């Protein structure tokens, strides 16, 4: 069987971990007290809000607000992450995923601080947007189908278009429940890391 049709270990285990935690939280902690208190990322001046902890830069990536949020992120991770893990290697792929996720949170915190806004953050979207960026950079001319478009587009144009859309939505303030700048941040940190690795001749594209 072609290995590219199989799911490599890091992608598989990330999907399992996210899904298991999603189900466990709804069975054990249905009103999300534990998650809100300890696992999602808090950045706020509200003295009554849960405290910020540095480990939340990791744990927030494994929480999702609903099934649609979880499914969208895990489907994109599975679709694009498999190829990248085979090409980067499992250890480097995991490093890339985590760097994008942490970097996404840092960018969103920076924007929230500049605007004087309180922030709570959860979800793997920042890391997944980094995965999308990497696929577009390393396979720019691959044709992909994007719902609801009736025709395929090149991966590079999908990534550019998505980045522009996220920036526009972030600045417009539309759909304020979505961390648009975290999505952009995941892409930026991902691009920086890919360029650094290429400079070090650890990857080629």
Regions found by a protein language model. Name each.
Residues 1-205:
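A detector for small-residue-rich transmembrane helices and their helix-helix packing motifs
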């Amino acid at each position: 069987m072609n290995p590219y049709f199989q799911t490599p270990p890091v992608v598989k285990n990330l999907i399992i971990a996210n899904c298991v935690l999603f189900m466990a939280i709804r069975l054990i902690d249905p009103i999300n007290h534990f998650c809100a208190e300890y696992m999602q990322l808090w950045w706020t001046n509200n003295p009554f809000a849960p405290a910020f902890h540095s480990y939340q830069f990791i744990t927030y990536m494994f929480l999702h607000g609903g099934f649609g949020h979880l499914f969208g992120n895990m489907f994109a991770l599975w679709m694009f992450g498999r190829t990248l893990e085979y090409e980067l290697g499992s250890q480097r792929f995991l490093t890339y995923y985590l760097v994008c996720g942490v970097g996404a949170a840092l960018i969103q915190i920076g924007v929230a601080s500049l605007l004087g806004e309180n922030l709570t953050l959860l979800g793997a979207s920042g890391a997944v947007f980094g995965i999308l960026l990497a696929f577009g950079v390393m396979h720019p001319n691959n044709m992909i189908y994007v719902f609801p478009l009736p025709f395929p587009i090149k991966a590079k144009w999908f990534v550019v278009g998505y980045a522009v859309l996220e920036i526009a939505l972030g600045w417009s303030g539309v759909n304020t429940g979505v961390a648009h700048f975290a999505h952009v941040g995941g892409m930026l940190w991902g691009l920086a890391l890919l360029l650094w690795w290429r400079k070090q001749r650890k990857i080629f594209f």
